[in-house]
């Protein structure tokens, strides 16, 4: 009986991030696309500024990488989030499952692992579908900074 009850507990509640299989780890990604928006770094302060400019490999409508398996060939600067480097990514969105679980929190109600699809996430406007622009359309990157410093507001 106890064994049956254990199987009803979702893996993200019964395992640490380190204990998860690669498939479980990958499934935590809600596919919001926020990681795939370009970030700019202030050369003087190292502060990170978020833009609404999508990576060339991001399909803005689906919020999925066009070449996920080969993304590093197409985009050498693409960032690979791993169990080891997770603590160094302070910029991850507050809604990111990796961040939430690392902080001992649960997945949000709209997460695709709970709802079975990305529809609720898109409905909550968590994904970049509603704000992202194509890199090829950008003239002045600074016009696309979302979290401008006080002096630039």
Curated annotation (Swiss-Prot):
Give me the disulphide-bonded residues: none
**TM segment ranges:** none
This protein's name: UPF0260 protein YcgN
Listed InterPro entries: Puta_zinc/iron-chelating_dom (IPR005358), UCP006173 (IPR008228)
Q: Which NCBIfam families match?
A: PRK05170.1-1, PRK05170.1-5, PRK05170.2-1, PRK05170.2-5
Pfam name, any one: CxxCxxCC
Top-rank lineage group of the source organism: Bacteria
Task: Print the organism lineage.
Answer: Bacteria, Pseudomonadati, Pseudomonadota, Gammaproteobacteria, Enterobacterales
Q: Which family does it belong to?
A: Belongs to the UPF0260 family.
* Matches recorded under PANTHER family: UPF0260 PROTEIN YCGN (PTHR37421:SF1)
């Amino acid at each position: 009986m106890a064994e049956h009850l254990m199987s009803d507990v979702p893996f993200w509640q019964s395992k640490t991030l380190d204990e998860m299989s690669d498939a479980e780890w990958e499934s935590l990604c809600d596919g919001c696309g926020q990681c795939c928006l370009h970030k700019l770094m202030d050369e003087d302060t190292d502060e990170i500024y978020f833009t609404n400019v999508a990576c060339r490999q991001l399909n803005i409508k689906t919020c999925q990488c066009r070449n996920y398996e080969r993304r590093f060939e197409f985009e050498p600067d693409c960032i690979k989030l791993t169990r080891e480097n997770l603590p160094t990514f302070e910029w991850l969105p507050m809604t990111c499952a990796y961040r939430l679980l690392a902080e001992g929190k649960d997945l949000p109600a709209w997460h695709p692992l709970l709802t079975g699809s990305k529809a609720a996430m898109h409905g909550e406007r968590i994904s970049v579908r509603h704000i992202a622009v194509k890199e090829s359309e950008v003239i002045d990157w600074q016009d696309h900074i979302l979290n401008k410093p006080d002096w630039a507001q």
